[in-house]
Amino acid sequence: MIIKKPKGTYDLLFDEISQWQELEKKVKFFFENYNYLEIRTPIIEYNEIFNRTATHSDMVNKEIYNFYDKKGRLIALRPEGTAGVVRSYIENKLDFNENLNKFYYLGSFFRYERPQKGRYRQFHQIGVEVLGDNTPFLDLEVIATVSEMLIFLGLKDFKIIINTLGDESSYKKYIKVFNDYIKKQDIFLCSLCKERLKKNSLRILDCKTCAQKNFLKSVPLITDYLNDFSKQRFDSVIKGLKFMKINFQICPHLVRGLDYYNHTVFEIILNSDSIGKRNSLGGGGCYDRLVEILGGHKTSGIGFALGTERLISVLKKYDLLEYSNNNQIDVYFLFLDSKLFFKSLFLVNQLRNAGIKTEINYRFLPFLKQLKKALKYNPKYFVILGEKEDKNNEISIKNTINQNQKKLSQLEMIKFLKKELDL
């Protein structure tokens, strides 16, 4: 019986891998120009990290993959990137310095969700975390970063939707008003939102079922309960977005799915329905309390994450993702006698070490059969070694496009091919 891949996962092969590599290359180039440094954290973390940072979220309560290791420690496959980056930031004592730390990451994440178009149980994200300062100008920098990155990749038909959750005192004031209002409307709540009312009531604003009901359209807005500091901070972000000519829209009902956000929160939305019913590429926001929650010194942060699968789907739709033909090689090496295999492999390795993409057949075959295999790789050149060439320390090189063929010494082989291939 054939063993198949687990539900909600997929394999990447051939041209698709090339497209992913092209995207990753562009993203790394872009982030490094913005002075972000790559960070890589384990795909496993202690489950406690996510319990501390997102206690009431669906991610922790329903979707997390976790298991006990052989010593009884509860381990989780990471469901998101921020908690692991912050854990690393604290563990490596970066919260003691006064530097601004700007990180980017690309990697795999895991959630036990119902698989559907654009949503998988193993998925990938491109993310940014900036730790070490609390200023609206940093919010603006991070939002501008994601906006400019998408433009750099060729996307234009998107906008940033933005809101503020205020500081801690503004949030507490609002959440009391919000809960009092919702409790009076609880007969209209769906079953999921009735559970949310007990734990993380603000997530009711994010419910697609309840969003269509009139009672939620009349809910009090957090922007009416901000203190002066929170209001001025958000006003500065909005003023900056206008000055930077970033396409945005204030959305007073926008909340994020994790508990640790405060102040600015945002999502990146496609204006056209490019990826099915879900038109969000990702989102992010500020977190002033997260470092402290995980045991570090009080440090502010802000970040965002984009779904890589969704991003690739959109880029492919608009033909914005270039890829090379992985099957095409520079040289296919043909040897005409089984006694010449060792010499042939020696020359092949010389070509490869010189940066020339080369393949050879590892079992001796008659010339026409070797040629048939070679043509599947669509090589730019054939390099041919026969008894006569070997005796004279020569090699035959044939251009597969114009069919020109010439003999030259084996010592000249690499120099000639590098010139011809413009390497």
Swiss-Prot record:
Reaction it catalyzes: tRNA(His) + L-histidine + ATP = L-histidyl-tRNA(His) + AMP + diphosphate + H(+)
Entry keywords, A to Z: Aminoacyl-tRNA synthetase, ATP-binding, Cytoplasm, Ligase, Nucleotide-binding, Protein biosynthesis
Keyword Protein biosynthesis applies: yes
GO molecular function: ATP binding; histidine-tRNA ligase activity
Any single biological process term in GO: histidyl-tRNA aminoacylation
Its EC number(s): 6.1.1.21
Pfam families: HGTP_anticodon, tRNA-synt_His
GO CC annotation terms, alphabetical: cytoplasm
Family matches, as Gene3D superfamilies: Anticodon-binding domain, Bira Bifunctional Protein, Domain 2
InterPro entries: aa-tRNA-synth_II, aa-tRNA-synth_II/BPL/LPL, Anticodon-bd, Anticodon-bd_dom_sf, His-tRNA-ligase, HisRS-like_core, HisRS/HisZ
Locations listed in the record: Cytoplasm
Family of the protein in this entry: Belongs to the class-II aminoacyl-tRNA synthetase family.
Summary of subunit composition and partner proteins: Homodimer.
Protein name according to UniProt: Histidine--tRNA ligase
Originating organism: Phytoplasma mali (strain AT)
